């Protein structure tokens, strides 16, 4: 019988342990990553993790003996020889091409979940902390909704000629379920491109033409076609009833609880015990406060400050991230502040803004003038009066860390993954052909993450694949779309720099994708892109508007941000026997649906929270800070308006360039230690992740990391190692429920309280002076 119709469960078993169970639905991204050539045996696991697991598929039908009909495969035979064991034991090797994929039901549910996901994700951009929209929730919710539609919709054929379709083609299929997950993930990522119209409105009083903003967003997002398939088998088994009940209970409890830290009782969002014992002592308050301080021993009961990364990140990654936090926030910040180092206290160490030499706010708008050709230049006379754009110590060494992270990704991959990459590439080159699947035009990346899967390639051949010309067309559409917008001077960047943005974005794709593949940790490339852009626009006649730098950063970054997901999820679609054209079509549809929603939410937040997110007032909760937008504006001022040539001529900024050297030396040291002491597992200490985590800005809110490492140690160290079956059964479903409950609460508060101007009265747990009761500020 077709494998899609089998009710199955996945038994996830670590190479050295026993039988934890997990649904393939929630395993799909991990399955794709675990097939990669470089696998670590770090004892933590998550959909974004890097642990090697043996996934074994057992029959799980609790109501019949359907498992007797399961085909038995001889995995020792030649036809399976080139298929990795982890893939052999998870995916099905039979396919029913008659199962419906794109139907009225899947389109309707995809549109609903895309709208919800894009709304929540866009709201999160304006907050200091947030929990990602969990696609796992979509998978859980779409199955019963799909079955409901299959029962209630009429079997009516909508007469549209060759495009006629049925409202109800029969039972809800696993392929419909999977395609909904693809669309929801593509549409719920949020749109980084909305940062451009947001910053234009917040800092320059410019309202971008909505059409330009939308087409710029579509072009940027379609550069890589981001999507993820989260499906292998449906949640049909009766044994799932208990887990689903627990999921909804946790979701509801989280939804109710979040009213306390987010609205009614914000005191619990940042418990600062040091402040309780010396609430009027400035030094103690700085050390203990999670808002504006370094959050030493600070505990949070707000899930947005924790998120499900305590479950989805491997434990080694969590430790690396926490070490980066400790070094920068608990050590370097106090040293700089109390030692009056790196510009402290003249430049606020807890700010990511820009300052004049005397510490006053930098008047960046007064430095910009536009010539008759519509090109923005620097008013050099005014610049001589204002001087260099300085930044606080924390933001300055953030640049250092990002430079180190960027270089480290290349060196790390060369040292730790280089031999494996070369071996696989030579083997595939010797074969004389590449996969006959949808990745055949990306052979380098395909060979890094997928071995020859002959039988699966045969199964997918029944579906028309994307031809070379179709790939070219799908690539040219967003490229031309963006080129027109850039050439018409709608995004303030010189046209020729657009092509450089594509080139540098492509160069970063390989090492950054590999780091993500083995860790689940996404590395930013923005600061390096800004440096390159800053030097390029030193050319005479180039626009120097800070928003041009942001447009360049968005375009260049999206090249690899989207490509990494395409690489991963093309494999998943391959494993699930999904028609390539259907997958592409749903991706495009998800982007078309999501972007107008993103734009509308962006305008709504600016309208209702403008004073907070623009920095004119301080949000009492410390959440609606818009700190990311401020960081991008600071970077635009320093790299585009002032320029790196002037910036790094200053002794204040010159040490930042040593970040490149640190990024090259650190992975080499770790590699040598790993070669000398392989049993110590120095290879788990990924320097790229360390530098990236150390570059995180904690000026507005430092509560969270301490609580997160405590919970992460409990989940991904103690439970994973010593209560593995319990962990595997409940960890992911709990994380998804907690994230979903938080996001539902966030959406409710914004729609029904935030937009209406409803303000919580002040009381002991919502003190007007300090919700943490740190009164020395």
Model-derived segments and spans:
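Alpha-helical multipass membrane-protein architecture
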Residues: 2-777
């Amino acid at each position: 019988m077709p494998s899609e119709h089998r009710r199955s469960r996945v038994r996830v078993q670590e190479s050295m342990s026993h039988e934890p169970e997990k649904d393939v639905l929630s395993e799909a991204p991990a399955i794709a990553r675990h097939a990669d050539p470089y696998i670590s045996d770090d004892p933590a696991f998550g959909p974004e993790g890097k642990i090697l697991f043996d996934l074994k598929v057992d029959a799980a039908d609790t109501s019949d003996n359907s498992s007797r009909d399961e085909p038995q495969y001889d995995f020792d035979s030649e036809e399976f020889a080139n298929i990795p064991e982890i893939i052999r034991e998870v995916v099905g090797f039979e396919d029913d091409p008659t199962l419906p994929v794109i139907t009225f039901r899947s389109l309707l549910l995809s549109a609903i979940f895309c709208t919800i996901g894009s709304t929540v994700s866009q709201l999160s951009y304006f907050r200091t902390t947030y929990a990602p929209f969990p696609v796992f929730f979509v998978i859980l919710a779409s199955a019963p909704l799909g079955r409901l539609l299959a029962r209630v919709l009429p079997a009516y054929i909508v007469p549209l000629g060759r495009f006629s379709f049925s409202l109800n083609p029969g039972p809800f299929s696993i392929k419909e379920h999977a395609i909904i997950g693809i669309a929801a993930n593509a549409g719920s990522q949020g749109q980084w491109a909305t940062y451009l119209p947001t910053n234009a409105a917040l800092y320059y009083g410019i309202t971008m033409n909505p059409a330009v903003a939308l087409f710029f967003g579509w072009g940027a997002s379609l550069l890589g076609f981001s999507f993820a398939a989260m499906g292998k088998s449906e949640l049909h088994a009766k044994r799932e009833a208990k887990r689903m009940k627990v999921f909804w209970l946790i979701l509801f409890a989280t939804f109710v609880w979040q009213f306390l830290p987010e609205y009614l009782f914000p005191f619990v969002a940042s418990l600062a015990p040091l402040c309780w014992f010396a609430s009027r002592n400035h030094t103690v308050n700085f050390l203990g406060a999670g808002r504006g301080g370094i959050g030493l021993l600070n505990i949070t009961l707000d899930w947005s400050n924790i998120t499900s990364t305590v479950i989805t990140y491997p434990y080694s990654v969590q430790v690396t991230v926490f070490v980066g936090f400790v070094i920068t926030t608990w050590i370097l910040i106090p040293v700089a502040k109390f030692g009056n180092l790196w510009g402290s206290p003249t430049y606020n160490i807890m700010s990511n803004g820009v300052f004049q030499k005397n510490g006053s706010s930098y008047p960046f708008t007064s430095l910009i003038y536009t010539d008759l050709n519509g090109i923005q230049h620097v008013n050099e006379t005014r610049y001589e009066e204002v001087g260099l754009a300085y930044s606080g110590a924390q933001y300055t060494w953030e640049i250092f860390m990002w430079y180190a992270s960027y270089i480290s990704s290349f060196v790390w991959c060369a040292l730790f993954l280089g031999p494996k990459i070369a071996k696989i590439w030579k083997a595939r080159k010797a074969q004389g052909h590449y996969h006959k699947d949808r990745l055949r035009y990306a052979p380098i990346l395909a060979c890094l993450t997928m071995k020859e899967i002959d039988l699966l390639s045969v199964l997918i051949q029944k579906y028309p694949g994307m031809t070379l010309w179709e790939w070219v067309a799908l690539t040219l559409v967003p490229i031309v779309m963006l080129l027109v917008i850039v050439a018409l001077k709608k995004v303030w960047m010189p046209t020729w720099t657009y092509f450089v943005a594509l080139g540098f974005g492509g160069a970063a794709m390989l090492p950054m994708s590999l780091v993500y593949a083995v860790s689940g940790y996404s590395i930013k490339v923005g600061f390096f892109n800004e440096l390159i852009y800053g030097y390029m626009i030193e050319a005479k006649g180039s626009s120097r508007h800070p928003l041009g730098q942001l447009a360049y950063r968005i375009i260049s970054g999206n090249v690899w941000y989207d490509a990494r997901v395409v690489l991963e999820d093309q494999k998943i679609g391959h494993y699930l026997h999904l028609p390539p054209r259907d997958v592409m079509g749903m991706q495009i549809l998800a982007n078309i649906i999501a972007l107008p929603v993103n734009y509308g939410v962006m305008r709504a937040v600016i309208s209702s929270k403008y004073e907070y997110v623009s920095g004119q007032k301080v949000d009492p909760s410390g959440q609606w800070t818009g700190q990311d937008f401020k960081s991008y504006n600071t970077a635009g001022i320093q790299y585009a308006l002032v320029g790196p040539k002037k910036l790094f001529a200053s002794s204040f900024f010159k040490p930042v360039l040593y970040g490149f050297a640190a990024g090259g030396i650190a992975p080499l040291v770790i590699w040598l230690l790993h070669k000398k002491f392989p049993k110590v597992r120095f290879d788990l200490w990924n320097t790229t992740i360390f530098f990236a985590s150390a570059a995180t800005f904690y000026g507005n809110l430092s509560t969270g990391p301490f609580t997160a490492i405590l919970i992460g140690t409990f989940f991904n160290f103690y439970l994973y190692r010593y209560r593995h079956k319990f962990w595997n059964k409940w960890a992911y479903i709990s994380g998804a429920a907690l994230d979903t409950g938080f996001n539902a609460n966030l959406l409710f508060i914004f729609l029904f309280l935030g937009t209406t101007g409803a303000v919580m009265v002040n009381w002991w747990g919502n003190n007007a002076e300090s919700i943490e009761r740190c009164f020395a500020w």
